[in-house]
Regions:
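C-terminal lobe and pocket-closing loops
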Residues: 337-342, 352-360
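Bacterial N-terminal signal peptides
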Residues: 9-20
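N-terminal secretory signal peptides that target proteins for export/translocation
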Residues: 1-7
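Aromatic- and charge-enriched surface segment that lines or borders ligand/interaction sites
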Residues: 84-100, 104, 126, 233-237
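Boundary at the C-terminal end of the N-terminal hydrophobic targeting segment
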Residues: 23-27
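Flexible coil segments in periplasmic/lumen-exposed cytochrome c-class electron-transfer proteins
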Residues: 31-32, 43, 51-70, 102-183, ...
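C-terminal structural cap/anchor segments
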Residues: 305-343
Length: 406
């Protein structure tokens, strides 16, 4: 649940390119606060973007690609020279709530402060307390590689004026406590919209198309609203919770950046929080209509069917039913029926391996076909699975596949 616009790979960037400020308070937080902060840090998927070297977790240095150039994630360890070791609690709160560095400069919105602004002060400081327990690692990040004039941070003040609305999440008194907890996570800490909401030409969320899906690192982060084919209309609350907790359900499997989100974040969440997210997502109504799917040509469907029967039926079966929670079913698959075919193309080209989580330890894999199929053949077989068995989605072209190979 990665980003387009300012938001880079993985569902999820906390960018602290900072200078030192006032010293950290010496008081040791209680163990329960640190444990809470660890859980919140996992829910925010901070490690995915702030870990370039697995041997140096949270030390930053990972390059985040944006349409405007590269940005490097910062060091969240308590190193005093290159990390957060000299930050005060107030420095950390201002960064999370307002996107402002200790020296007063603005962060770029690749760091999802437009979402983190919704967190309570207690939760922000619990995250801070947990990060302070990490082993300090000296690791200086390269400067951002943004093109002129975006390399001037002062311009972010204009961006904030136009698009940023700070403020803690306000519960809806007409909704249940569970729905409000889900909203707090979806809209705030988990920052789902950072990947699943399309962006405008300046990298800000298109509010007229909230959760309508967006391209992230060559994959399509699908709709999270109630759209019939490409959204969650056919998923129950339990389906959504199972997917977030395990990376799979009876409808689909997590692949690409979303697989990392499940591995590093949602699979670590409590059952209660996963269920709360599912309750909230299930009530999101489509903000933008699904595009009508024109039936592909009979020739392309016939060619795609031949390829499918030759390469796919051993695992996915002739009727596309697959194997429960090992090889995903293809009929009714929302990822397949997304208006944008990027994810389906990527899986055929690169193959896939089902992630394993404590809730779903068994695995399955699919070989890559990039070297075995031409661009047209990939387009044909993807078009076929997107339109067979009652599915409906736009046809895929060889040009789209060629672009995905680059």
């Amino acid at each position: 649940m990665r980003r387009q616009g300012w938001d880079g790979p993985a569902i999820l960037v906390t960018l602290f390119l900072c200078t030192a400020s006032s010293p950290v308070a010496a008081a040791e937080p209680p163990p329960e606060t640190i444990a809470k902060g660890k859980a919140l840090t996992e829910a925010g998927d901070c490690g995915s973007c702030h870990t370039a070297d697995p041997a140096k977790p949270f030390a930053g240095g990972k390059r985040i690609a944006t349409p405007f150039g590269g940005i490097y994630s910062a060091n969240l360890t308590p190193d005093r020279n290159t990390g957060l070791g000299l930050w005060s609690d107030e420095d950390f709160r201002r960064a999370m709530r307002f996107g402002v560095r200790p020296d007063g400069a603005n962060y770029y919105p690749a760091f999802p402060y437009p979402h983190f602004t919704k967190l309570t002060r207690d939760d922000i400081l619990a995250i801070r307390a947990y990060l302070a327990t990490l082993s300090p690692v000296a690791n200086t990040q390269p400067a951002p590689e943004l093109r002129w004039p975006l390399n001037y941070r002062v311009l972010m003040r204009l961006w904030n004026f136009a698009f940023f609305r700070p403020g803690i999440f306000e519960p809806d008194q007409n909704k249940s406590a569970e729905w409000n907890r889900g909203g707090y996570l979806v809209e705030g800490l988990a920052h789902c919209g950072a990947c699943h909401t399309p962006k405008n030409f300046l990298g800000a969320d298109k509010q007229s198309a909230r959760f309508a899906g967006s391209v992230v690192d060559g994959w399509f982060a699908p709709r999270l609203d109630g759209a019939m084919r490409g959204g969650l209309k056919s998923w129950s609350v339990e389906d959504i919770a199972e997917y977030l907790g395990s990376g799979r359900n009876g409808h689909s499997h997590a692949d690409g950046p979303m697989a990392q989100v499940v591995l590093n974040s949602t699979s670590h969440m409590s059952d209660a929080d996963v269920h709360a997210i599912a309750v909230y997502l299930k009530e999101i109504q489509p903000s933008a209509p699904e595009a009508a799917a024109t039936a592909p040509s009979p020739t392309q469907m016939a060619d795609g069917e031949k390829l499918y029967k030759g390469a796919c039926i051993a695992c996915h079966e002739l009727d596309g039913s697959g194997a429960p929670r090992i090889y995903p079913p293809l009929p009714g698959n929302t990822n397949l029926q997304s208006e944008n075919p990027a994810s389906a193309i990527r899986i055929v080209l690169d193959g896939a391996e089902t992630i394993t989580t404590p809730r779903a330890p068994n695995t399955g894999s699919m070989p890559p076909y990039a070297s075995k199929m031409s661009d047209q053949e990939v387009a044909d077989v993807v078009t076929y699975v997107r339109n067979a068995w009652g599915n409906a989605a736009p046809a895929v072209t060889a040009a789209e596949v060629a672009k995905a190979r680059k």
